[in-house]
Amino acid sequence: MSAALSRDATLLAFDYGEKRIGVAVGNLLTRTARALVIVRNLNREHRFKAVGELIAEWKPDALVVGLPLHPDGAPHEMTQRAMRFGNQLNGRFNLPVSWVDERYSSVEARAGLRARGDAADRVDAEAARVILQQYLDGLPDHHEFN
């Protein structure tokens, strides 16, 4: 993200999948993320209507999209689909999009859900939380704010 964000900026993160899109919300001030919802990825119209409603509700300053990669870091088919989704988010909602390497985010999400005794059907939203938390944890302590 090249533009400076306000100290209390709200972020939405997405774990894009062919059937489901996990969504998480976070805040720069607290540097914490939480799983929010799972959007069923039925078709483009449904996907962007649901995402538009979330954006209207949460009024994020920026978006984060998980970038699926092979274990060796090489891109694959889902990499391109996630990139297309993120670029469409930017084009439709005019919000900056950052990319986060999401390798093993679903593994970490499943482990976290099991440890807490939470429902396994929340794994996509939890994976989005993991992605957003990785983004927040990766910000330098001196992150530039407006």
Curated annotation (Swiss-Prot):
GO molecular function: nuclease activity
Keyword Plastid: no
One Pfam match: RuvX
Disulfide bonds: none
EC number: 3.1.-.-
CDD domains xref list: YqgF
Cell compartment(s), UniProt: Cytoplasm
Keywords: Cytoplasm, Hydrolase, Nuclease, Ribosome biogenesis
GO CC, one annotated term: cytosol
Biological-process GO terms, alphabetical: rRNA 5'-end processing
Top-tier EC class: hydrolase
Top-level taxon in the UniProt lineage: Bacteria
Family, as annotated: Belongs to the YqgF nuclease family.
Biological function: Could be a nuclease involved in processing of the 5'-end of pre-16S rRNA.
PANTHER family in alphabetical order: POLYNUCLEOTIDYL TRANSFERASE, RIBONUCLEASE H-LIKE SUPERFAMILY PROTEIN
UniProt protein name: Putative pre-16S rRNA nuclease
Organism: Burkholderia mallei (strain ATCC 23344)
